[in-house]
């Protein structure tokens, strides 16, 4: 049995619920960045994955705020071109 779902017909909230249900359990990472003022930022991400090892490629799904502006993590990455992906162990609850 197969289903066809037109993602363009779904709201952003419906797309999010559908896509997050595709991979279970969802790996969680704390992505840490530093602002141009030296302020540390840590944000949880479940939209991330490894896409290669040579070169090493990590993809982050950076969401925007409800008003469409970038969140601190994206702003910090764009300013300093640096971030750290910290993996959460399954034993941490």
Region annotations inferred by a language model:
Residues 1-93:
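N-terminal structural module
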């Amino acid at each position: 049995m197969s289903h066809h779902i037109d993602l363009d017909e779904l709201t952003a909230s419906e797309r999010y619920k559908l896509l997050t249900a595709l991979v279970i359990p969802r790996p969680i990472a704390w992505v840490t960045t530093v602002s141009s003022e030296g302020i540390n930022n840590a944000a949880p991400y479940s939209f991330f994955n490894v896409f290669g090892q040579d070169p090493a490629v990590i993809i982050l799904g950076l969401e925007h705020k409800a008003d469409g502006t970038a969140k601190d993590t994206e702003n910090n990455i764009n300013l300093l071109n640096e971030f750290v992906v910290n993996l959460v162990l399954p034993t941490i609850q």
